[in-house]
Amino acid sequence: METFLFTSESVNEGHPDKLCDQISDAVLDACLAQDPDSKVACETCTKTNMVMVFGEITTKADVDYEKIVRDTCRSIGFVSDDVGLDADKCKVLVNIEQQSPDIAQGVHGHFTKRPEEIGAGDQGHMFGYATDETPEFMPLSHVLATKLGARLTEVRKNGTCPWLRPDGKTQVTVEYYNENGARVPVRVHTVLISTQHDETVTNDEIAADLKEHVIKPVIPEKYLDEKTIFHLNPSGRFVIGGPHGDAGLTGRKIIIDTYGGWGAHGGGAFSGKDPTKVDRSGAYIVRQAAKSIVANGLARRCIVQVSYAIGVPEPLSVYVDTYGTGKIPDKEILKIVKENFDFRPGMITINLDLKRGGNSRFLKTAAYGHFGRDDPDFTWEVVKPSSGRSLNLKVLVVIIPACFIELIIGCLMLMLNSPYSIEVSYMMI
């Protein structure tokens, strides 16, 4: 059996880039909670003892930007200079302007357009991906790297590993084989964890704790063997971290946010953007489409692309590729996708309820991935169900003599109470 290796990485919530993503999305949450029609394009950057929030925001909400910054930093664990940033003492700079009137008139007509008329906030192309290799319909390499990062944070905050500090990175290499276009995991080849720590712990203690409290609870035993390689804090020292160790900026972890290098990426970041920004809403709807295709058994693996022009509601293109794993031709799957998913930005917003802020809804997306999460706030993860009735009908027609076909079809029409249901393969409701 010929196999290949594929690697995905992740970073946890204390990484400076992820800190910025979380602040940007915390601002978005605050705006949408008070004013669902807020137009938000919020960026954040950070370096030693400083956080800056900047961008374009048009909202009726009364937002205390400095408080959001400090609360977000504190909740992550940046509570002293020793760990890389002190939430209560750092400088907070704010430079927010209104959305450009040129953009406003073209996209939403200064709030006068109906939802179906709202145009895309910018040009661009977005990708959604799904695979049947995990229950989350996500790539295993990405799932494991992401869960390791989340587990690092969990054992830091619950005191299991008190020597841990907020910053950290993970990486997992999985050995796969190709099963007629589908990807089947065989084993975990390599696990890499680099985590910030205090001065009190030895490298041997770090390695032992990471294996026992982080790796073992996350990676299923069936994927680990005597050949699995572990690189645990291979640099030998990681005391200086967070914004003290590296500058951070919103939107620099877009592969970690999505599929860990699988599928494709259009280049647009998500955090700090309201749903008129198709970088975010477009990526969410094509994830739902791709996941629905795989979850309904139409394919084992699928990528969906959508593209937009600024100010134009209808997408310029929609594309589907099942990598040869489709149960029916890709052109038929594309037809089903177009019939069941509305790719206009205003309608995506309604169908996925993307104007709803609060409850840290978008803040939750800003660490540990936007996809594959079991959370009711992640509405784009809801699979549109399939009936599959016409596929069964096709099988009956093949095996039953022609003289009975009209009778069978008539009976089925009465049972289904709709001739249309018989015509459409795998119709998603």
UniProtKB/Swiss-Prot annotation:
Its main location: cytoplasm. It holds the Pfam family S-AdoMet_synt_M. It is found in: Cytoplasm. It catalyses: L-methionine + ATP + H2O = S-adenosyl-L-methionine + phosphate + diphosphate. L-methionine binds at residues 56, 99, 246, 277. Homotetramer. This is S-adenosylmethionine synthase. The gene is SAMS.
